[in-house]
């Protein structure tokens, strides 16, 4: 059942020059800026008694604003007692270190058992925030840092920061192949034309930019540090596969085991058992959505990646004399 929303207020003189959607988001902090933008586009907003359907229209201050809208009841998700590794928390945000095998948001094939269900149990008031405060995601088997908003104002500002590319996200990964230098992949990404659960580089896709640098060389693998400018689904995995260096263990984009010649049984066994993409969100830096203070968190790589890197490093040391690129 839809919930009726009727709001009235006067634009402050201090908001002179702001976009209408920005001004309304400040005036009505219980509603996200994206929701307010939808109401404007749907002609649910009156400014001085006249319909306004332009979110970018500038306000002068002193306007009388009335909103007459409806909110469709969102799907109700169950709180579930799923452990969360909380790296940081205050009144406005939570930063978690997500493990593997944990989906962020319920969807087809994963109706529950997600980060969202865990958040609803850990902090019940987050149910009043759209998507339980989730503003960005990690793939099911990608580990590492995520920030979650505990309030609507915090969520609105975090989303805006993401859109302005003010949030820095860095990852560690292990890629297949010997890479000679770091670089940037600037290639648009969209849904795969035939495999609907896959993504692909496509000229008609959304802009996507990934920067990478080399941390360590192994015989036929490379340890990387990567930084996202954009946050497309599967972005790092798609971009690395596109440049013919898919991530180790990636079941979707070509990361099948490729042990080097003469590898030890320990190396081969570890590589074959590594059944997820070797990708970890290791650093998150942002400006706090309410205080504006710059904050930064780090999460060390998980044990499965530690073991993978150790056997690759041992193999490299054992066969260093056979490597032709040193």
Swiss-Prot record:
Reactions listed under catalytic activity: uridine(1911/1915/1917) in 23S rRNA = pseudouridine(1911/1915/1917) in 23S rRNA
Keyword Oxidoreductase: no
GO BP terms in the entry: enzyme-directed rRNA pseudouridine synthesis
Main location: cytoplasm
A single GO molecular function term of this UniProt record: RNA binding
Pfam family, one: S4
Cellular compartment(s): Cytoplasm
Record-stated family: Belongs to the pseudouridine synthase RluA family.
Protein name, as recorded: Ribosomal large subunit pseudouridine synthase D
Organism field: Escherichia coli O157:H7
High-level lineage: Bacteria, Pseudomonadati, Pseudomonadota, Gammaproteobacteria, Enterobacterales
């Amino acid at each position: 059942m839809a919930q009726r929303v009727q709001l009235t207020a006067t634009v402050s003189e201090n908001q002179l020059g702001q976009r209408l959607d920005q001004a309304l988001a400040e005036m009505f902090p219980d509603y996200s800026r994206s929701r307010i933008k939808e109401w404007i586009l749907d002609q649910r907003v009156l400014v001085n008694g006249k319909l306004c359907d332009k979110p970018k229209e500038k306000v002068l201050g002193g306007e009388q604003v009335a909103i007459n809208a409806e909110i469709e009841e969102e799907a109700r998700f169950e709180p579930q007692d799923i452990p969360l590794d909380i790296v940081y928390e205050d009144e406005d945000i939570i930063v978690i270190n997500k493990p593997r095998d944990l989906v962020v948001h319920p969807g087809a094939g994963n109706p529950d058992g997600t980060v969202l269900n865990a958040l609803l149990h850990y902090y019940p008031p987050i149910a009043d925030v759209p998507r339980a405060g989730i503003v960005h995601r990690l793939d099911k088997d990608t580990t590492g840092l995520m920030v979650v908003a505990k309030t609507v104002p915090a969520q609105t500002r975090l989303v805006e920061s993401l859109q302005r590319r003010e949030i820095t996200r860095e990852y560690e990964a292990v890629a297949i192949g010997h890479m000679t230098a770091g670089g940037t992949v600037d290639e648009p990404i969209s849904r795969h034309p035939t495999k609907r659960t896959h993504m692909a580089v496509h000229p008609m896709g959304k802009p996507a930019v990934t920067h990478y640098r080399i941390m360590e060389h192994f015989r036929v693998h490379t340890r990387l540090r990567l930084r996202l400018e954009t946050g497309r689904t599967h972005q790092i995995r798609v971009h690395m596969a596109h440049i013919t260096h898919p991530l180790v263990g990636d079941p979707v984009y070509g990361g099948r085991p490729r042990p080097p010649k003469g590898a030890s049984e320990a190396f081969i066994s570890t590589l074959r058992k590594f059944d997820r993409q070797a990708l970890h969100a290791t650093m998150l830096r942002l400006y706090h959505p309410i205080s504006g203070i710059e904050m930064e968190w780090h999460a060390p790589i998980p044990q499965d990646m530690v073991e993978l890197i150790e056997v690759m490093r041992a193999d490299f040391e054992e066969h260093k004399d056979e490597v032709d690129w040193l």
